[in-house]
UniProtKB/Swiss-Prot annotation:
InterPro entries: QueC, Rossmann-like_a/b/a_fold. This is 7-cyano-7-deazaguanine synthase. It comes from Archaeoglobus fulgidus (strain ATCC 49558 / DSM 4304 / JCM 9628 / NBRC 100126 / VC-16). The lineage of its organism: Archaea, Methanobacteriati, Methanobacteriota, Archaeoglobi, Archaeoglobales. Binds 1 zinc ion per subunit. Catalyzes the ATP-dependent conversion of 7-carboxy-7-deazaguanine (CDG) to 7-cyano-7-deazaguanine (preQ(0)).
Length: 239
């Protein structure tokens, strides 16, 4: 069965790709450039798709940037160096992003005869990002069905009840090449290790008792140190 999926180049969507392949799907991966501050994840998506030997399309919709430019990922705000919290996550929201990307993916699915569109929304994103919630998935699935009633397409988020640590655990079993993925909100040569998504990534690999394969031994030691220091500082504030 054909399936279209959103592939960002991060660990969640890369795991989803390998999960779908393991399930016997013919995967068509879409990666979007919508005006992000850097292209590191897009480059990683290309590497992951090549390693998995799947059809991969990079779609430039950057002309919408001025319409949705907001916060730290597409706007002028600096990337916050802190664990995810309601305040931090609100600063990293791209308004209506998944609605836009999944709508395009659904149209592409109809074109190629795919019956499903998948994306890697998960439990760790659930509390703040509105377009990663079960309610959103269900509502968009209904909307896509109504919009394409003669050629029905389902919208699915198979990781919606999983944490990032759960996703990494699955990916390790599936042999996901995490060394090719990119999560950092910064666009440097190496991950900054201290933005919200870097900290969450470190936490996920720590929870599984393994080193992040993207990092050198020295970088991993530094990542764990930063994680533990910022976690202790964060817990101190809540006491």
């Amino acid at each position: 069965m054909k399936a279209v999926m959103l592939l960002s180049g991060g660990i969640d969507s890369s795991t989803l790709l390998y999960y779908l392949l393991d399930g016997g799907y013919e995967v068509h991966a879409l990666t979007f450039f919508y005006g992000q501050k850097h292209s590191k994840e897009i480059e990683s998506a290309e590497k992951v798709a090549k390693a998995a030997k799947v059809r991969h399309l990079k779609v430039d919709i950057s002309t919408i940037h001025d319409l949705i430019s907001y916060g730290a990922l597409t706007g002028e705000e600096e990337v916050p160096k802190a664990f995810y919290s309601e305040e931090v996550q609100r600063r990293t929201i791209v308004p209506n992003r998944n609605m836009i990307l999944l709508s395009i993916a659904a149209g592409y699915a109809v074109k190629i005869g795919a019956k499903e569109v998948h994306y890697a929304a998960h439990l760790s994103d659930y509390s703040i990002y509105p377009d990663c919630r079960k309610e959103f998935v269900k509502a968009l699935d209904t909307a896509v069905y109504l919009a394409n009633i003669w050629t029905p397409v389902e919208v699915r988020a198979p990781f919606v009840d999983m944490t990032k640590a759960d996703i990494v655990r699955l990916g390790l079993k599936l042999g996901v090449p995490y060394e090719l993925t990119w999560s950092c909100y910064e666009g440097g040569d190496r991950p900054c290790l201290s933005c919200g998504t870097c900290l969450e990534r470190t936490e996920a690999f720590l929870a599984n008792g393994v080193k992040d394969p993207l990092l050198s031994d020295e970088e991993w030691k530094n990542a764990v140190k930063i994680y533990e220091e910022m976690r202790a500082r964060n817990e101190g504030k809540s006491d």
